[in-house]
């Protein structure tokens, strides 16, 4: 039976500081390391044999993957990394304190940017964009594909082709797959898997460092889901 494990990275240093993070590359906090370690322990305690893992290009997800596989004694399995699993790009909001953003733009506007399905935050500046384009991890990426800002809908548009072309192929082969990613890239996968409406998906809360297991049919219909 195919099995999919979705796990949002452990708490990051910017999560702890209440900052918009998006594509900014930050480390796990001490709490986040503990969450990721515990996630791996839960995988081991439940005797889940992972065949392959997928993660983003951002350190907090990469490190979470490492802790999960190390603690479950499966660090030797293949791990594939893709920008398509990166967090939603929060544009010009990245690096801002969320409370400060509410004071500057208004509570309602910030809520719309955060929780609407198809509304993007303000675009990043050209200077911010140039910093991403200079980052070696994105050298392979056509700069026309590099977002200035993303809605959840935009995130889904880049995540689902990666699901179809890569992740789902291992599941169709009956394997157990770990996806260690981010709140919004995981939200996009859940929307697709469960056919969640545009209105409902924005209210889904994705816990940090909590493995969410999907048991699937051979054609990848959801049979059951549960947190470890």
UniProtKB/Swiss-Prot annotation:
Originating species: Staphylococcus aureus (strain NCTC 8325 / PS 47)
Functional summary from the UniProt entry: Catalyzes the interconversion of 2-phosphoglycerate and 3-phosphoglycerate.
Residues annotated for substrate binding in this entry: 8-15, 21-22, 60, 87-90, 98, 114-115, 183-184
Keywords linked to the UniProt accession: Gluconeogenesis, Glycolysis, Isomerase
CDD domains found in the cross-reference section: HP_PGM_like
Gene3D superfamilies: Phosphoglycerate mutase-like
Pathway of action: Carbohydrate degradation; glycolysis; pyruvate from D-glyceraldehyde 3-phosphate: step 3/5
Cross-referenced HAMAP family: PGAM_GpmA
One Pfam family named in its UniProt record: His_Phos_1
NCBIfam families in UniProt: pgm_1, PRK14115.1, PRK14119.1
Membership in a protein family: Belongs to the phosphoglycerate mutase family. BPG-dependent PGAM subfamily.
Enzyme Commission no: 5.4.2.11
InterPro entries, A to Z: His_Pase_superF_clade-1 (IPR013078), His_PPase_superfam (IPR029033), PG/BPGM_mutase_AS (IPR001345), Phosphogly_mut1 (IPR005952)
Catalytic activity annotation: (2R)-2-phosphoglycerate = (2R)-3-phosphoglycerate
PANTHER family: PHOSPHOGLYCERATE MUTASE
GO BP: any one term: glycolytic process
Site (Transition state stabilizer): 182
GO molecular function: phosphoglycerate mutase activity
Gene name of the record: gpmA
Top-rank taxon, per record: Bacteria
SMART domains, A to Z: PGAM (SM00855)
Protein name in the entry: 2,3-bisphosphoglycerate-dependent phosphoglycerate mutase
Keyword Membrane in annotation: no
Active-site residues from the entry: 9 (tele-phosphohistidine intermediate), 87 (proton donor/acceptor)
């Amino acid at each position: 039976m195919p099995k999919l494990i979705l796990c949002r990275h452990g708490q990051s240093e910017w999560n702890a500081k209440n900052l918009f993070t998006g594509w900014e590359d930050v480390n796990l906090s001490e709490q986040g390391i503990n969450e990721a370690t515990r996630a791996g322990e839960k995988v081991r305690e439940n005797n889940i044999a992972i065949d392959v893992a997928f993660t983003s290009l951002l350190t907090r997800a990469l490190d979470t993957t490492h802790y999960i596989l190390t603690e479950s004694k499966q660090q030797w399995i293949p791990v594939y990394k893709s920008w398509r699993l990166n967090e939603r790009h929060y544009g010009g909001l990245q690096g801002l304190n969320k409370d400060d953003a509410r004071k500057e733009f208004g509570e309602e506007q910030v809520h719309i940017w955060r929780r609407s399905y198809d509304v993007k935050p303000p675009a990043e500046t050209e200077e911010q964009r140039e910093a991403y384009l200079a980052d070696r991890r994105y050298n392979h990426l056509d700069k026309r594909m590099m977002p200035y800002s993303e809605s959840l809908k935009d995130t889904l548009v880049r995540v689902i082709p990666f699901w179809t072309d890569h992740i789902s192929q291992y599941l169709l082969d009956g394997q157990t797959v770990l996806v260690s990613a981010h709140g919004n890239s995981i939200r996009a996968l859940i929307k697709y898997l469960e056919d969640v409406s545009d209105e409902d998906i924005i209210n889904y809360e994705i816990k940090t460092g909590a493995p969410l297991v999907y048991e699937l049919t051979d054609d990848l219909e959801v049979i059951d889901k549960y947190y470890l």
